[in-house]
UniProtKB/Swiss-Prot annotation:
Its EC number is 2.7.7.6. SUPFAM superfamilies: RPB6/omega subunit-like. It is an enzyme of class 2 (transferase). The RNAP catalytic core consists of 2 alpha, 1 beta, 1 beta' and 1 omega subunit. When a sigma factor is associated with the core the holoenzyme is formed, which can initiate transcription. This is DNA-directed RNA polymerase subunit omega. Residues 110-130 are annotated as: Disordered. It comes from Bradyrhizobium sp. (strain ORS 278). The gene is rpoZ. One of its GO terms (cellular component) is DNA-directed RNA polymerase complex.
Amino acid sequence: MARVTVEDCIDKVDNRFDLVLLAAHRARMISSGSQLTIDRDNDKNPVVALREIADSTISPEDLKEELVHSLQKFVEVDEPEPDTVPLIGSAGASVDADDTEVAVERMTEEELLKGLEGLAPPEEQPEEDE
């Protein structure tokens, strides 16, 4: 059997580095029990993976998808958002009629400062050394 080199596979995957990543991922898949698409012929898993890519029995695009999926730690699921989001306190919400006429009292800065001056400062507590 002739040796499989990167040159045999370079027409299937343009980038040599991508080819190595894909072949290594396929070799790991074979090690974990994935079905072979060609005869083993007493070859090791990386050689079998390269032969599968060279013979086009495995799609490089599918291998790339599987590689990306295996490296993801969190898979984000896109859910359609509703067209309109109900606002809090909108007219459509169940609000009592009495709540709509609440008057908010405004304070000036001077009134706020006077109110703060009237507050008692917190008592100082002695620090305990442990």
